[in-house]
């Protein structure tokens, strides 16, 4: 189920209903993937991963909502290619931490990061962000 397609009242009611609700954040990038693939290849893959994970959890009677995707990330390896939009590690990490804080404040039980962008700077950033999110008291 996609969070962005819900009303705020539906989200409130789900979180207040006593069930533990997980959030899944698709993490991709806008970067070159050769001459044959779109710039949002990582976003497409991470969204598919997140939807599949939410469906598998639903099959087990668990509730998970897919958040709107992150389409910008550190993309240093592809930065020289036209169309690639690389953001700093600090900016990307700050955004993910802000999202996690908001989810925790609203009562989400945990956050899963569905990443398909494996630039080393991005992977390191996600690991560091996950450590900080756990320190906030939100399981990742």
Describe the function of each predicted region.
Residues 1-38:
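Active-site and ligand/interface coordination hotspots across diverse enzymes
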Residues 17-27, 62-74:
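Short coil-to-beta-strand
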Residues 23, 72-140:
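Active-site histidine-anchored catalytic micro-motif
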Residues 42-55:
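Short catalytic helix/loop segments, enriched in acidic residues and glycine
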Residues 56-61, 103-107:
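A structural motif corresponding to the C-terminal end of an alpha-helix
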């Amino acid at each position: 189920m996609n969070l962005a397609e819900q009303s705020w009242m539906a989200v409130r009611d789900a979180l207040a209903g006593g069930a533990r609700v997980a959030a899944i954040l698709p993490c991709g990038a806008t970067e070159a993937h050769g001459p044959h693939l779109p710039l949002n290849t990582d976003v497409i893959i991470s969204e598919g991963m997140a939807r599949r994970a939410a469906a598998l959890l639903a099959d087990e009677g668990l509730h998970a909502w897919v958040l709107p995707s992150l389409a910008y990330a550190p993309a240093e390896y592809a930065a020289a290619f036209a169309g690639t939009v690389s953001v700093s590690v600090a900016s990307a990490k700050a955004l993910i931490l802000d999202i996690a804080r908001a989810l925790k404040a609203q009562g989400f039980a945990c956050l899963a990061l569905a990443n398909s962008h494996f630039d080393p700077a991005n992977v390191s950033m996600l690991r560091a962000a996950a450590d900080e999110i756990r320190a906030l008291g939100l399981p990742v």
